[in-house]
UniProtKB/Swiss-Prot annotation:
Major localization listed first in the record, in broad terms: membrane
InterPro entries named in the record: Protohaem_IX_farnesylTrfase, UbiA_prenyltransferase, UbiA_prenylTrfase_CS, UbiA_sf
Membrane topology: Multi-pass membrane protein
Name of the encoding gene: ctaB
Other information: Carbon 2 of the heme B porphyrin ring is defined according to the Fischer nomenclature.
Protein name as catalogued: Protoheme IX farnesyltransferase
EC number(s) on file: 2.5.1.141
UniProt xrefs under PROSITE patterns: UBIA (PS00943)
Length: 295
């Protein structure tokens, strides 16, 4: 009996953890770290840790509320029907309460412990994802990911504000990189999940305009992304090294975009989706390395 209780508790904890969309949360935190490291000045390590926890909780909050709102369409799609709410492991009410609670806490703690500007930016990012992307855009327009992608681009700007207590065009350069990265990243996934999105009546770009046009736009956004990725060289300490890394990673990104146009198959699209994640980690790791004093 005791063992069963422990298993049930562990299962419940894991399900609430899944509500936070941890894979997205890891990327959010990493890009926030890049914003903090690239910003001029310094911050106490404890405050930096508090800030990152708040950013992670804010991201998780948006993810949980997104799952609460999308529980009807999640039930219709193979990719999402096993999520905690549609599978019945977590009630919709509990998920909403959980998401709202950690979201409010993350913004409140950020405001009290760090500064108001970073707290306001965190709140804007959470609310944008919930109200602009999830509730307004996702089910209404094929531009859902293009516009809604702005919500996922806030973390480096927040990280910058954590250190400087201000916003800067340099922080928004990092924002722009993620903004340009989001469409090719998600469209590569949606090409392989067209039936799911059609069944759930989600007007993804490929569902509305077809796979051929989607692949062309993936290439267009990939080129724009690579060009945008060069901009941090304007303010990073080791600009030549960064440019080399950005061009190297960007050429591979464009190669994948060209490959899916030529091959038009599931495997190439899956490879591009996977690489796009590695690419963003690689690019922001390069930003971090070129912002710190190694010697």
């Amino acid at each position: 009996m005791h063992a069963n209780t422990l298993l049930n508790v562990e299962s419940t904890v894991l399900d609430f953890w899944r509500l936070l969309k941890p894979r997205i949360m890891y990327l959010v935190v990493f890009t926030a770290v890049a914003g903090m490291v690239a910003a001029p000045g310094s911050i106490h390590p404890f405050l930096a840790l508090i800030s990152l926890i708040c950013i992670a909780l804010g991201s998780g909050s948006a993810g949980a509320i997104n799952m609460w709102y999308d529980r009807d369409i999640d039930l219709l799609m193979k990719r999402t029907k096993a999520r905690p709410i549609p599978s019945g492991r977590v009630s919709a009410e509990s998920a909403l309460e959980f998401g709202v609670t950690i979201g409010v806490l993350s913004v409140f703690i950020m405001a009290i412990a760090v500064n108001y500007i970073s707290a306001i930016l965190l709140a804007i990012g959470i609310l944008f994802y919930i109200f602009i992307y999830t509730i307004w855009l996702k089910r209404r327009t094929p531009q859902n990911i293009v516009i809604g992608g702005a919500s996922g681009a806030f973390p480096p700007v927040i990280g910058w504000a954590v250190v400087t207590d201000s916003v800067s065009w340099r922080g928004f350069v990092l924002f722009l990189i993620i903004f340009m990265w989001t469409p090719p990243h998600f469209w590569a996934l949606s090409l392989n999940k067209s039936e799911d999105y059609e069944k759930a009546s989600v007007p993804m770009f490929n569902v509305v305009y077809g796979p051929e046009k989607t692949r062309k736009y993936i290439l267009v956004y990939s080129v724009l992304l690579v060009l945008t990725s060069l901009l941090p060289a304007l303010f990073l300490k080791r600009a030549p090294f960064y440019l080399g890394m950005a061009i190297f990673g960007g050429c591979i990104f464009i190669w994948h975009a060209v490959s899916i146009m030529k091959l038009k198959d599931h495997s190439s699209q899956k490879r591009m989706f996977s690489y796009s994640i590695s690419y963003l980690f690689f690019l922001f790791a390069s930003i971090i390395l070129c912002s710190i004093d190694l010697f």
